From Swiss-Prot:
NCBIfam families reported in the protein's UniProt record: PPR
Pfam families: PPR, PPR_1, PPR_2
Keywords: Mitochondrion, Repeat, Transit peptide
Organism phylogeny: Eukaryota, Viridiplantae, Streptophyta, Embryophyta, Tracheophyta
Gene3D superfamilies: Tetratricopeptide repeat domain (1.25.40.10)
Family recorded in the similarity comment: Belongs to the PPR family. P subfamily.
Primary residence: mitochondrion
Subcellular location field: Mitochondrion
Cellular component per GO, a single term: endoplasmic reticulum
Transit peptide interval: 1-21
InterPro entries with a match to the protein in the record: Pentatricopeptide_rpt (IPR002885), TPR-like_helical_dom_sf (IPR011990)
SUPFAM superfamilies for this protein: HCP-like
The name this protein goes by in its record: Pentatricopeptide repeat-containing protein At1g05670, mitochondrial
PROSITE patterns tied to this protein: PPR
Length: 741
């Protein structure tokens, strides 16, 4: 049972950091002073240029024409007046028709289409739009000014603002006009000018709305160089009358989380309540997402409890964040439960949530669960995107099902989705791991034709596949191609080539290559040295392997468990079991936790030497240390006991292996069947064979020979006739396939 969160009650350490956080919002201001509200001044009177008698008559004529017109367009009605029309006439006509807002807009559009309007007339129409509550038109008119090319921002701002103030009193007197002007400046990134508007409005006794200030705060928070300014603004604006609201706090909480300062964000959530504000779902969801990013699941659950106590229900954003975290830390059962709870609450999961789950299950190798969610998306009419397809394709590639991966890749194109470099690279990687290099290069060519440039990861994947196939010449060609197109091979690229050289027996060439890329400024890593050690161990040069280890340690590189397992395998492979046990004891003494692979090397060699007592002792030792045996452990022990004809023990271990869900190889089935046949346990041999057949595995020629020999010797033919027929069929099919290839 989780302990309930104490809300505003804080531990001493938390209280201390909370005080520090409040001090963060009480920093000295730096050049952000305000004029006091007592120094306010009135808006100026508007005094337009006086019209001459002739101009007055001309304006009167135009006004009558546009007022009396019916359905006739203005361009036709005012055609006779075009040549005499001047900018001053525009303002004088606007004064006559300002009570008819629709007519104002039509006339202003007509005037602007004939000649450029001056800034004064633009400000007048902006005021009239705001007075008519048409804020969208006002915003559009202000934006059109700032969209002009080659505009001197500093001078233009002064002129625009001064004229907006000058025309304010007689043309609208709606303070929202300055909010709109301010917000447009912020949208255009003119933050310094926006700040000046805020300060200048204080001189006239006006404080911009909290919505405008929130727009400003949001823009500041998105600029990594202005986060300090955002904090100062958040602290200072209330001093001159800005009343922050919940949305304001949410903005600050969000950008504090983005800075990675999740504790401070949580403190700000508490500060909201101290100041009398009630956090909403967005407030909590932002902090929850922050804790999810940093993997602090316990704090997430506590915040959820607080939310529920306050009557707030988690939203889709919160569920998505929690599911994402649970998938990242491999708690997929809990992630699935959170998903089910989301559905029960009536919240429809989106593409992001489904993709997160699909990706999580694929990475664990549970392609069945991933596929279930993928096809469930279709049934809910939720469209998979490129990321969704990439995740599921990667999952099928991971288990080697390249047929299904290829089908899904084709399906993407049919649905109009364009794979990105990650999708192409995942598919290429799958084909490379499956040894289908022709298909890998086919996808590589497709990638280039689709206009998607292969990156270092793509080339490294292909190089790795070629090296594992032993085609080092082609791998080197690709390496040179990388250089040619300006891609810099990284340590993963070179490690693939080093591994290929070692696998082909060219250890000295591999060592030479390491020297060359290190001389070029690229440092070898633990994988590089472990690969060289493995090559020397397999060739029996244990002294050189240990020298490589010393060199690696001398460079400050930390060996991994794989490094020690390579050394252990080398000792065991060459009969140096005492050295292997010494290495194991040294690892334990140094606090280096061995894994199943470490113990397996010893178990295997003791089984090969028929020393089942020692093998069993190693097995018991690993179990007592909390290291669970894997499939290889059981295979080694089953084969060892079969070889020693301890069929009872072999059968027990085989059953335990199956019970734990480990896959059994053909060779293990074969050894067990042969063991039972040698001990004349025909029923047991048949039972193992039936299990093998249910797994879809075909017996080899050796098993066929064993059953044949037993049959012709007249030993229990009723138990073996059916298996012989099946073995012959499978064996002949295999032979035909080999002949065809």
């Amino acid at each position: 049972m989780k302990k309930p969160f104490t809300g505003l009650l804080m531990k001493r350490g938390t209280l201390s950091s909370f005080r520090n956080f409040i001090q963060l919002f009480s920093l000295q201001s730096r050049g952000l002073s305000f004029s006091t509200l007592t120094d306010t001044r009135p808006f100026p009177d508007y005094s337009p240029k006086k019209a001459s008698v002739r101009d007055t008559e001309f304006v009167h004529q135009i006004t009558n024409v546009i007022k009396l017109r019916r359905a006739e367009p203005l361009r036709r009605s005012l055609k006779p007046y075009e040549c005499k029309f001047k900018t001053d006439h525009l303002i004088w006509v606007l004064m006559k028709i300002k009570c008819d807002y629709r007519l104002v807009l039509d006339f202003f559009d007509w005037a602007r289409s004939r000649r450029d309007s001056n800034l004064e007339s633009l400000c007048i129409v902006i005021h009239l739009a705001v007075a008519s509550k048409d804020l969208k038109v006002a915003q559009s008119l202000i934006s059109s000014f700032w969209e002009r090319p080659k505009l001197n921002v500093t001078d233009s701002f002064v002129q625009f603002f001064d004229l907006l103030v000058y025309t304010y009193k007689d043309w609208g007197s709606d303070p929202r006009v300055f909010d709109v002007f301010f917000q447009v400046l912020v949208d255009f990134g003119l933050l310094r000018e926006a700040r000046r508007v805020f300060e200048k409005m204080l001189n006239y006794g006006l404080v911009l709305s909290v919505d405008s200030c929130n727009v400003y705060l949001t823009r500041l928070s998105k600029d990594c160089y202005k986060t300090a300014t955002a904090i100062i603004v958040f602290r200072e604006f209330p001093e001159v009358g800005v009343c922050w609201n919940v949305a304001s706090y949410n903005i600050v909480i969000h950008f504090v989380c983005q800075l990675g300062r999740i504790k401070e964000a949580h403190h700000l959530l508490l500060l909201m309540e101290l100041k009398g504000y009630t956090p909403d779902v967005i407030s909590y969801s932002t902090v929850v997402n922050g804790y999810c990013r940093f993997g602090e699941l316990d704090k997430v659950w506590k915040l959820i409890e607080v939310m529920k106590r306050k009557g707030l229900k988690p939203n889709s954003y919160i569920y998505g964040s929690i599911i994402g975290l649970l998938c990242r830390i491999c708690k997929l059962a809990e992630a699935e439960e959170a998903f089910s709870e989301m559905i029960r609450q009536g919240i429809l999961p989106d593409t992001v949530v489904y993709t997160t789950l699909i990706d999580g299950f694929c990475k664990r190798g549970d392609i069945r669960a991933a596929s279930k969610f993928f096809y469930e998306m279709h049934s809910r009419d939720i469209t998979p995107d490129v990321l969704t397809y990439t995740a599921i394709i990667s999952g099928f590639c991971q288990i080697g099902d390249m047929v299904e991966a290829g089908k899904l890749f084709h399906e993407m194109f049919c649905k109009g989705l364009e794979p990105d470099s990650v999708t192409f690279t995942e598919l290429i990687n799958g084909y490379c791991k499956a040894g289908h290099m022709k298909d890998a290069f086919r996808v590589h060519n497709h990638m280039i034709q689709a206009g998607c440039s292969p990156n270092v990861v793509t080339y490294t994947t292909l190089i790795d596949g070629l090296c594992k196939e032993g085609d080092l010449d082609s791998a080197n060609e690709l390496l040179h191609e990388m250089w040619k197109i300006g891609l810099q091979p990284n340590i993963f690229t070179y490690n693939s080539i080093v591994n290929g050289l070692c696998k082909s027996g060219n250890i000295e060439e591999a060592v030479k290559l390491v020297g060359e890329f290190e001389a070029a400024g690229l440092n070898a890593d633990t994988v590089t040295y472990t690969t060289l050690m493995d090559a020397y161990c397999k060739s029996g040069e244990m002294d050189k392997a240990q020298e490589i280890l010393k060199e690696m340690l001398g460079k400050g590189l930390q060996p991994t468990i794989v490094t020690f397992n390579v050394l252990m395998n080398g000792f065991c492979l060459h009969g140096m079991l005492e050295d292997g046990e010494k290495l194991l004891n040294w690892m334990l003494a140094k606090g280096i936790a061995p894994n199943a692979t470490t113990f397996n090397s010893l178990v295997k060699q003791y089984c090969i030497r028929n020393n089942l007592k020692a093998a069993t002792a190693i097995y018991k030792d690993m179990c007592s240390r909390g290291v669970g045996p894997d499939g290889k452990t059981y295979e080694n022990l089953v084969k060892g006991h079969c070889k020693a004809r301890n069929m009872k023990e072999a059968w027990f271990l085989f059953q335990e292996m199956k019970g734990k869900g480990f896959s059994v190889s053909v060779s293990t089935y074969s050894v067990l069947i042969k063991g039972f046949l040698k001990r004349k346990k025909f029923l047991e041999a048949r039972e193992v064979f039936d299990q093998m057949r249910r797994e879809g595995l075909a017996a080899d020629k050796e098993i066929f020979d064993f059953f044949s020999d037993t049959k012709y010797k007249g030993k229990r033919p009723d138990t073996i006739v059916d298996p012989i027929d099946e073995i012959i069929e499978n064996y002949l099919v295999d032979e035909q396939l080999r002949g065809a290839n």
